[in-house]
Every structure is written in C-alpha cells, then in structure tokens.
Amino acid sequence: MVVDGKTTRLRASCNACNESKVRCSQRKPTCARCERNGVECIYGLSRRTHKDAPPISMPPSQRSHNHPRGASRSSSSGGDTKANSNSSSNWHMSPNVPFMIPPQQQQQQQKEEAAAAAAATPRFQCMYTPQDATADTVNRAGLLLDMDFSSLVTGSSSPLTSVDPLSAAVTRFPTPGAEHTNPWALGPFFGGNTNNNSINNPDWTRQPTTMGPMITVPTTAPPSPSPSCTECSCHAGVTELLSSMRGGGDDRRLSLDAQLAKLKRCIVSSETSMGCAHGRDDAEPIHILAVSTLIGYVIDEFEMLASESPLRLSSSLADMSGSRNAERVAESILSSGSDESMSMSSMAATTGVNNMSMSMSMGNLLEPRLSWGVLELEDDDEVDLRQRLYLLSFRKLERLLSQLTIYLRNLHDARAGLPEPSRHMAFVMACDYTRLWLEKKAEDVKRMFLVARPAGDETMDPALMFTAH
C-alpha cells in the first residue's frame, strides 16, 4: 500500500504491544515501526474516537492534512515495491467497514475469533456469539467479509458493493425469508418450530455457510413402528423349505425318520402361513401360491414313499442274499476255468457284486430300525409299522388340504363383496384350480398306499383307512 509516496507493510500485530486485538484507549496506539518511520500509525483505528476518519482507499489529495491515515515504509528493492503494489489488489473491502483490511490481518483475526467462539459456545451451537458493542470494528471484520449479511436477514436483494468471489454461489439461489435466516433463532434447527420443516425446505440446504466448518445437527429419532406395522414372519418357514427343496434329488436320499420329520415340518409351516392375520383386506394373498407349491412337494414325497415302502426292507434283504449267491458263483467260476476272457468277465462281475453289496449294506446302516424298548421287531412287523407311520402322516396332509379348501372358500366370499369383484376373482379361481389339482394328486397317492398294504392284513385300524371322495 502506498501512502504519501511511502510503501508500508502492515503486520497482524503491533510491535509495541504484540497484540492483534487493540482496544480503544485515551490515546491512539502507535507501533514502533511507524514511530521510527515518522508517520502516524493506522493500525487499530479506534471506533469510539476516530469515527470521522476518512477511508484509507481515498486518495491522499482528498484527505485532511490534520488526520493522515497512511503508513509508509522504505523499500529496499524495486521487487518489494512491485510485490507490495500487486498484493494490495488482493485486499478486500467490506461494505460495512470504512477502511480496507489486509489479508494477513483477516486470517489472523478469523483464527482467533474461531478459537474464542469454540471455547465459549456449547456443543452443537452453530452460530457465532456477538461481541460487545464497544469492540473494535477490525476485530469483527472477519464476520462481515465478502458478503452483506444484512441483505440476507432482511430479505433485500441489493447487490454487493464489491466484486465477491462467492457472490455467484450466494446469488444463484433464492434468498430465504427472515424467519429462516435469523442466525440467533435456533428453534427450527432443533425441532422447536413445527411449522417449518428443515428437511423439506430447500432454502436450508442452499444457504451458504461462512461462519466456519459445517456442523451436523442431530435430527430427531424416527418414531418406533407400531406392532401392526412390523414385519410378518408367518411365511418364513414356507420360504425356507421351498428353497431347501429346489434340489429335489438330495431329499430322496434321506433316511425314513428324517424324511417323515421334514414332511411334518412342511405341513406345520403351511398351516402357519394360512393362519396368518397380518395381511391387508384389499391385498391378494400371494403367499397361498407358495403354500400350494409346498403341498405339491409333500405329495410327491408321499408318492415316493408309497412306491418304495411295501417291499423296501424285504427287497434289501433279498438283494443281500442274492449278492452272496453271486459271490459264490463267481468264486466257483474262477476256481474251475482257466480262460483269460472268462476270468476277466468273472472279475468284473465280482467287482460289480461287491459294489452293490457294499452300497446296500451302507444303505441299511443309514436306515434306522424300528424298536420298542428292548423288543426286537421282526422284518415283517417293521414293514407293517412303517406303513402305518406313512398313513398317519398322510392323514395330516389330507387335513391340510381340507384347511386349504376352507381358506379359499372364505377368500371367495370376502372378494365377492368388494366393489370390483371381477378384478379379484381371477386370483381366487387360479388358487381354486391349484387346489383341485393337489386333491387329485393326493387321491392317486392314497390309492397307492391302499394297494401297497401288506397282504393278509385285514385287521387294520378303520381310522387309518381312507375312503374315496
């Protein structure tokens, strides 16, 4: 800055007191550097005693000779003079301050004011606490730098008095009202004002922040959902079982006890899903299709048991005895014949027989035997008991089909009373046709169980007998 032909460089603090914040006193403070140069110091102009001081940006010819406001300093080289003259163009003029502020002093003041505000303000306080009215204007210049806050508070659209690099970001968005931009009204910010929603109001998100880093304000916790709005878990069992049955082939290698336990679980999960009361009255119960699919899997498993159960154990015992006879025949062929081709074929036959016998023995080890305490059941009795267990489990399946029929009948009556019944009856008809298909499959499996009943068993419990519909 050039004043009266002399170049001066102002520091952020005075050499005499080494303080950047100089309060007003009886006499105007003067730094030692200005006294050494024989000029009047312009550092720390007192707001109380120098209100009539002319702006520094005013040319020296227009200033009063009684109140010089400049400071000069001898420059050691022409490079310093050029650098200082170029740096003077980077100074900013605040519209509310009657003099210019050097960038070094602005940065120092902003750092000190931010530290003082952080130490004095409580947690989550976003705004700067105003100082006393007698404070120096220079100390508050950082708050008024680069933009006119009065236009934001009052809602006026007066242009800024200086070229502001942040003016584009400020004037790009509409200016909010005074009730939203009052920096001391934190009621709406913390939920005190219920009329203005800070989340739905775009002006809050667009307002520029010049007081420092943005502080996240904790929002109110969302209301806890009511019990009726919670997620329903009545259909989780059906979904899990359908996912596990997609392989298909692995389930057929389960033992009989594990197979019956899984079928019972499928029936119970289907009953739980049909008894769910969390659905809406106007929504279509899509879960009934998943229940119908699971019932179809159960019928397929019962069909497999009905086709394999009557002679399962007896056939395995017969295969074991047949394998032993085949081994004896192979041994006799090996001992009597010397032909190479015959020996090779007999060795292949022996290997196949051994593999079959090993697989059958492993299957018998995996298959649990029925017993009653210390009583060892005979093979025929065990086959008969297994058959009765299948029939008891199949009775539960028929009861599930009856519940499905009642459920669809109630659904038909409920949808018939709606304003547009034709729009809902298509879904009911699809479910009803699926039910008819399942009942037809169940009847076929039931006939297989009746045909596979052990011969000579005329004393079967009538409760286990099934009559055709």
Curated annotation (Swiss-Prot):
Residues 104-118 have a biased composition (Low complexity). Transmembrane segments: none annotated. PROSITE patterns: ZN2_CY6_FUNGAL_2. Pfam families: Zn_clus (PF00172). Residues 14-41 bind DNA. It comes from the Eukaryota. It is found in: Nucleus. Residues 82-93 have a biased composition (Polar residues). Its main location: nucleus. GO terms for molecular function: DNA binding; DNA-binding transcription factor activity, RNA polymerase II-specific; zinc ion binding. GO terms for cellular component: nucleus. Keywords: DNA-binding, Metal-binding, Nucleus, Transcription, Transcription regulation, Virulence, Zinc. CDD domains: GAL4. Residues 49-118 are annotated as: Disordered. SMART domains: GAL4 (SM00066). Transcription factor; part of the gene cluster that mediates the biosynthesis of the phomopsins, a group of hexapeptide mycotoxins which infects lupins and causes lupinosis disease in livestock. May play a role in the regulation of the production of phomopsins. PANTHER family: MONODICTYPHENONE CLUSTER TRANSCRIPTION FACTOR-RELATED, OLEATE-ACTIVATED TRANSCRIPTION FACTOR 1-RELATED. This is Transcription factor phomD.
